[in-house]
From Swiss-Prot:
Gene of this entry: lpoA
Family under the similarity heading: Belongs to the LpoA family.
Biased composition (Low complexity): 328-343
Keywords (A to Z) from UniProt: Cell outer membrane, Cell shape, Lipoprotein, Membrane, Palmitate, Peptidoglycan synthesis, Signal
Residues bearing a lipid moiety (N-palmitoyl cysteine): 27
Signal peptide start-end: 1-26
Protein name: Penicillin-binding protein activator LpoA
């Protein structure tokens, strides 16, 4: 006999999707036929068969057919119909469950809620913990509980809980002390020990989540010397020069001086446009090759293509590292800023990766006393760090901040990856749009490899955030867009799925994310966000075509990447972009206007090089916080290219600034 349980929390909340997991857990344990007290029911028929039998059956067997129908509907991707059947099932009290059933129930509830972090999912893990006997399963439960907690949206973590939920209160207090102290490892270590004393009955007090165990084992390390590995000749030279100048300016404290001057001038009500300029190249010594430190400054129309040079980034569109107890140059939000407050005496040497093989340069850097490597820049050189045995041997135990990210990442305990990639920006956009409550995004992308990469990155991040299908539409050249305008065809707000989303496994059954292959339009209430990857010229053609398709009362929100940002655009362009949100690095969105004025003049308005200069500034900050980025989960640096944090594999993520065009002005997006 098949059993059905629709369980109710004592707070009265229903979890109908949980029942689906219970159904699957029950049904997958059945043989080819499910034996009831009346007749054998085939367990692998289609949903329509079960629904028909359900209508013709008595109450004793009707529920069995209904359970199997729901299971079949889910397998067939007919989720709305499955949800209707779930809602029709009878509720019973969870107190009637025995221990094995409670374990199956809690696991089902976890499986059903994994795609969207919530307090109810945390409660499910808490309910499961005392039912587990295997030590490895207990540790996994603790780690998953913590992972869910740190992923909770702020409104969820601030909800009022029941007075008798002592274990949940302990977990929330652990989350709070982590968030309050994660920027200072020593304070965090002490706070965790105090928490363990105050909550001795909490499962995590006995066995910490793995990330917090790493915090307890944290050890800081000073930077004895830095080797900057960049291509100083060839097409990528201009990019290297921009990065090197930003790195040197941060090392010498020049960016902090600019910030101080801005604050003083702001307090006095004065402009900072007249701040003296400095090329920021002092303090680095070329080694292993010649270096043109000032470098040629090219106009936007003459510099080489970064992609052709192997540079993957947005260019295409304190004497020691701080100790655990002090973080120099902290921002107002408690995060270390992108530059220490004074010039550093750490020796820095620059090595030319275009003149010598990488193993020779790494060996030379070690002989020269370097303990930290910044670079290499080109993607093929970065891939050598783990693909080439000679390079890997030469790297030894050196800490390495690679200035690019390979296509197929192979994590290494001594390597972090920092890139200004369009994929990174797409992931940030997916999270930003999802946090604004949008449900169905449409990507407007250029045809070709760039569009493919952005589509995959956005879609992956969207699914990870709990979103469903992402739609895409491709466009061609500006000439093709103009032809669409002239012909009256414009842009149709329809799309096809980027790809099948990650399948969800519930109680041993893998359920594909349902896809809608039909045309979807905002009039049908489906598409409520459009993310556009386009140049300023292309965007000036696309935006009016979209405006013609939707009414002024439409909830359709428009977003664009930094590829579309035109800093020197006139008032007409700003008015044309009304309502559009776009992302870019903090330096280009008003974080330090005087510094931006200096750098943009230095690079003759080439904002792609300004972004690489900002990357150099942040590379210096990351070098000074390398231990924290590698060992402290959630550690952040307020950088010029974004708020910087690291994944478990030490890929540096950037949370960007978002602005919005409103009445001809740019304001911070909400």
């Amino acid at each position: 006999m098949l059993y059905s349980y629709v369980l109710v929390f004592k707070t009265g909340r229903l979890l109908p999707v949980v029942l689906a997991s219970l159904i699957l857990a029950a049904c997958t344990a059945q043989g080819p036929e499910s034996q009831t007290g009346h007749a054998a029911i085939p367990a692998n028929a289609n949903a329509d068969y079960y629904l028909q039998q359900m209508q013709q059956s008595s109450n004793d067997t009707k529920t069995d057919y209904q359970l199997l129908a729901i299971r079949a509907l889910i397998k067939e991707g007919r989720l709305p119909q499955a949800q209707q059947q779930l809602a029709a099932l009878q509720q019973i009290d969870s107190a009637s469950l025995d221990a094995p059933q409670r374990l199956r129930y809690t696991q089902a509830m976890i499986n059903a809620g994994q795609s969207r972090p919530s307090l109810d999912l945390v409660r499910a893990y808490i309910a499961q913990a005392p039912l587990l006997t295997d030590p490895a399963a207990r540790q996994q439960n603790i780690d998953k509980t913590w992972q869910t907690l740190v992923s909770l949206p702020s409104p969820q973590s601030n909800l009022v809980i029941n007075a008798d939920e002592n274990i949940l209160q302990g977990w929330l207090d652990l989350l709070r002390i982590y968030q309050d102290n994660r920027q200072d490892p020593t304070l965090l270590q002490a706070a965790i020990k105090d928490w363990q004393t105050r909550y001795p009955q909490n499962p995590a007090a006995k066995t910490l989540p793995t990330p917090l165990s790493q915090v307890q084992n944290y050890s800081s390390s000073s930077v004895g010397g830095i080797a900057l590995l960049l291509p100083l000749n060839g097409q990528a030279q201009v990019f290297s020069n921009a990065i090197q100048q930003g790195f040197s300016a941060a090392k010498n404290g020049l960016t902090t001086q600019q910030s101080a001057l801005e604050q003083d001038a702001s307090a006095a009500g004065q402009s900072t446009d007249g701040v003296p300029q400095n090329d920021g190249t002092a303090g680095t010594e070329p080694a292993g090759g010649s270096a043109n430190q000032n470098g040629p400054v090219t106009t936007p129309g003459t510099r080489p293509d970064p992609a052709a040079s192997g540079v993957d980034g947005q260019a295409s569109a304190a004497d020691n590292a701080p100790q655990a107890t002090t973080l120099s140059g902290q921002s107002a939000g408690g995060q270390p800023s992108a530059a220490p407050s004074a010039a550093s005496g750490v020796p820095v040497k620059v090595y030319d990766t275009s003149s010598q093989p990488l193993p020779a340069l790494l060996a030379q850097a070690q002989r020269d006393g370097a303990s930290m490597i910044i670079g290499p820049l080109l993607k093929n050189d970065v891939e050598q760090l783990y693909n080439d045995n000679a390079v890997a041997a030469s790297a030894g135990t050196l800490n390495i901040l690679a200035l690019n990210q390979p296509e197929h990442l192979q994590p290494r305990p001594n390597i972090c990856y920092f890139a200004l990639s369009p994929e990174d920006e797409a992931r940030d956009a997916a999270n930003h749009i999802h946090q604004q409550g949008r449900q169905q995004p449409l990507l407007l992308l250029p045809r070709g490899a760039l569009g493919d990469r952005i589509a995959k990155a956005f879609s992956d991040a969207w699914h990870q955030a709990g979103g469903a299908t992402v739609l895409e539409q491709r466009f061609g050249s500006s000439a093709e867009l103009k032809q669409n305008i002239n012909s009256g065809s414009g842009i149709s707000l329809t799309g096809t799925p980027v790809a099948a989303g990650a399948a969800v496994t519930i109680a041993g059954l893998t359920i594909p994310v349902p896809q809608d292959n039909g045309a979807v339009s905002p009039s049908g209430g489906a598409i409520d966000a459009v993310y556009i990857i386009a140049t300023p010229v292309e965007l000036a053609l696309i935006k009016p075509m979209i405006d013609m398709r939707v009414s002024s009362r439409s909830r359709l929100a428009l977003y664009a990447s930094s590829r579309s940002y035109q800093a020197d655009a006139g008032p007409d362009y700003s008015l044309e972009m009304e309502g559009l949100e776009f992302s870019d690095i903090p330096l280009l969105t008003g974080a330090h206007p005087a510094l931006l004025s200096q750098i943009s003049a230095q690079f003759r308005g080439d904002y792609s090089l300004v972004r690489l200069y900002a990357m150099g500034i942040d590379a210096w900050a990351l070098a000074n916080h390398f231990s924290e980025m590698r060992q402290i989960p959630g550690f952040q640096v307020a950088g010029e290219t974004g708020t910087l944090s690291a994944t478990p594999d030490c890929v540096i993520n950037r949370t960007l600034s978002w602005l919005k065009y409103q009445r001809g002005q740019m304001i911070a997006a909400q």
